[in-house]
């Protein structure tokens, strides 16, 4: 139990009438700030506490601790002919007088940038670009930063053909026949777009002026321009954000409303489909999230549906979520991805991990909030069902890791110059979610946990933090439940590799799925002909399954069923009649599906069943998608059964993939 000493400082708000009688200490703790001594955590975890919080980010070459960024202004020009963005960035800086060099030098991150000139308070300044240090780039060193505590830094630059922040597509590579460019800056690629303090620990407000022959979207609110120059697009971001959240795209973009504060942008040929896919749900998601946390702070919430090569499901660029076209399933079955990106408006964008070691604070919280949103709308069993799907994805992710001992821990250690992209996996998402779900459960359920959610996001709004700041806040908020919190095996949850302790999930929406999958595994070993299977199974079996249930069904089949009695040596490749019968009987819901999640799981089942006639279909499909969730495991699957086809397919399509995706697939294939 948490005891004195403590210092009491009154809060600006008192909520005594709404509190149940839980003891004076509880009342006090919820409504005043308690300044507690450190080392309140269990000793085993206290021993891991860093010397300072937030922990220093080792994935930057900048001296960001020596300066505060008061504002950032981007003045950019997009050239499709040169596949380059040029222009300038202007920082309003303040010296913090920390560190041994007392800010005599200013260090910024760059990567494959052509830095042309540097000016401080209008005067030209000397600078050097240090030798490249993989994978962190090249440090930009500016001497004699300024004799003033507050000063303006202007840097002129141009991106190069080695830029990892942008993907350029010529007119032949887009379905609309116009060139296109989009950015992807997370985790450490902002430094390849413009010189910056490329760390999530540094936030600033932004303005941007972007010249392009084609429409532009940006991670901010469009400022109406009264000038006659229609090729210049101006934006403002009033909420401080880190550099990695900047998002820029330019191409043949059209727009349509999808809610009172939301617009969808995409190429004209898919605009109507995108509008239909999103218009029923986006505002509902926003209002539901506001009830769980607090008011949406960013004003507008817009969505850019990107080109096919976009590598992620979505990117939470503030005001302008970047989304994959694989969300367009023509039945609104993938809309929950938008709930995830929307949830980032609080977790990740408003409250941010201080370094990529603590990425779970972004993504674990976001998955938790995403599932709270869909649970509030569709019911608690739906939330638990989504968690079951996530648990399976987590197991698959860890099983496929080349170094699970290192990369399956919740808190990472990237302090040896490891590229954060190399550590990217489902772990921070699903392991992080399961920790928060476990805390919700042991602390008394949603009614007990929701006040902490609001407190946490208000306390760290517009700030960056590490795991220990999260833990300290948790313990401070629940002083009367210290014994419960101490019972958590923090060492296992945060620092041990592998799967976490499994929470209890409601399986109501999964039970029928498991039963049908088990029946197929059982019957595959006994029935001999297609007619036999048609007499036992019917398309009506899955008629009422939603897309997530279909995904779980196919995934459970590849795991040889769910039953405790499932055969250990079962192999679908030994039962080709059963495999083909299943796909034939359920073809309307599975084979003909336009939902990319279902389609991918179908291909996975076909590979497990070694249906060789289907390998080419998977290879062709890999040329139509760019989302790494499908591309990377797709190539691994194909490589496991036909390496020659996998290599030929990658060679054919590699230049259509985003640079990050291309590099990671090369690693996966051992190239």
From Swiss-Prot:
Changing residue 627 to K/A: Abolishes the aminopeptidase activity. Optimum pH is about 7.3. GO terms for molecular function: aminopeptidase activity; epoxide hydrolase activity; metallopeptidase activity; zinc ion binding. SMART domains: Leuk-A4-hydro_C. This is Leucine aminopeptidase 2. Substrate binds at residues 184-186, 311-316. The keyword Cell wall biogenesis/degradation does not apply. Binds 1 zinc ion per subunit.
């Amino acid at each position: 139990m948490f005891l004195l000493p403590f210092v009491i400082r009154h809060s600006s708000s008192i909520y005594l009438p709404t509190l149940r009688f839980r003891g004076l200490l509880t009342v006090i703790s919820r409504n005043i700030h308690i300044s507690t001594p450190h080392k309140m955590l269990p000793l085993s975890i206290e021993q891991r506490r860093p010397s300072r919080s937030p922990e220093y980010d080792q994935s930057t070459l900048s001296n960001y601790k020596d300066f505060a960024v008061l504002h950032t202004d981007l003045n950019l020009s997009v050239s499709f002919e040169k596949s380059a963005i040029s222009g300038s960035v202007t920082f309003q800086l303040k010296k913090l007088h920390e560190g041994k060099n007392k800010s005599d030098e200013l260090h910024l991150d760059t990567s494959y940038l052509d830095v042309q000139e540097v000016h401080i308070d209008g005067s030209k300044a000397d600078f050097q670009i240090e030798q490249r240090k993989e994978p962190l780039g090249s440090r930009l060193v500016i001497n004699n930063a300024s004799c003033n505590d507050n000063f303006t830094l202007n840097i002129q630059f141009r991106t190069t053909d080695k830029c990892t922040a942008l993907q350029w597509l010529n007119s032949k590579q887009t379905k609309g026949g116009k060139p296109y460019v989009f950015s992807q800056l997370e985790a450490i690629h902002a430094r390849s777009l413009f010189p910056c303090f490329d760390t999530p620990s540094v936030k600033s407000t932004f303005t941007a002026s972007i010249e392009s022959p084609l429409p532009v979207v940006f991670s901010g609110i469009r400022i109406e321009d009264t000038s006659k120059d229609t090729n210049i697009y101006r934006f403002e971001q009033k909420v401080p954000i880190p550099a990695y959240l900047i998002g820029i795209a330019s191409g043949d973009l059209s727009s349509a409303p999808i809610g009172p504060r939301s617009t969808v942008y995409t190429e004209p040929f898919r605009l109507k489909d995108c509008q239909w896919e999103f218009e029923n749900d986006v505002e509902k998601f926003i209002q539901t999230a506001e009830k769980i946390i607090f008011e949406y702070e960013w004003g507008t919430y817009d969505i850019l549906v990107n080109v096919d090569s976009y590598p992620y499901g979505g990117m939470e660029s503030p005001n302008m979520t970047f989304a994959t076209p694989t969300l367009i399933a023509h039945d609104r079955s993938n809309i929950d991805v938008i709930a995830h990106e929307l949830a980032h408006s609080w977790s990740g964008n408003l409250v941010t991990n201080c370094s990529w070691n603590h990425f779970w604070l972004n993504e674990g919280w976001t998955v938790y909030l995403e599932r709270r949103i869909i649970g509030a709308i569709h019911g608690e069993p739906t939330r638990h069902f989504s968690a079951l799907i996530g648990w399976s994805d987590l197991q698959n992710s860890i099983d496929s890791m080349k170094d699970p001992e290192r990369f399956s821990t919740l808190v990472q250690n990237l302090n040896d110059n490891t590229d954060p992209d190399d550590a990217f996996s489902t772990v921070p998402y699903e392991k992080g979610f399961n920790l928060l779900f476990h805390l919700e459960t042991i602390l008394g359920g949603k009614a007990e946990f929701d006040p902490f959610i609001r407190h946490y996001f208000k306390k760290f709004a517009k700030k960056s933090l590490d795991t220990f700041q999260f833990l300290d806040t948790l313990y401070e908020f629940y002083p009367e439940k210290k014994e419960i919190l101490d019972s958590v095996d923090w060492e296992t949850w945060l620092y041990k590799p592998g799967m976490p302790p499994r929470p209890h999930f409601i399986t109501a929406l999964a039970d029928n799925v498991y039963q049908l999958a088990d029946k197929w595994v059982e019957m595959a070993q006994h029935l001999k002909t297609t007619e036999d299977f048609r007499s036992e199974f019917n398309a009506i079996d899955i008629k009422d399954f939603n897309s997530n249930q279909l995904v779980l069904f196919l995934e459970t089949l590849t795991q040889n069923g769910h039953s405790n009695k499932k055969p250990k040596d079962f192999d679908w490749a030994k039962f080709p009649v059963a495999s083909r019968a299943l796909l034939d009987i359920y073809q309307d819901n599975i084979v003909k599906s336009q939902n990319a999640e279902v389609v991918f799981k179908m291909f996975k089942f076909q590979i497990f069943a070694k249906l060789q006639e289907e390998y080419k279909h998977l290879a062709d499909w890999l040329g139509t998608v760019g989302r790494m969730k499908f591309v990377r495991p797709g190539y691994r699957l194909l490589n496991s059964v036909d390496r020659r086809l996998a290599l030929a397919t990658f060679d054919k399509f590699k230049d259509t993939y985003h640079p990050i995706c291309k590099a990671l697939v090369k690693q996966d294939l051992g190239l």
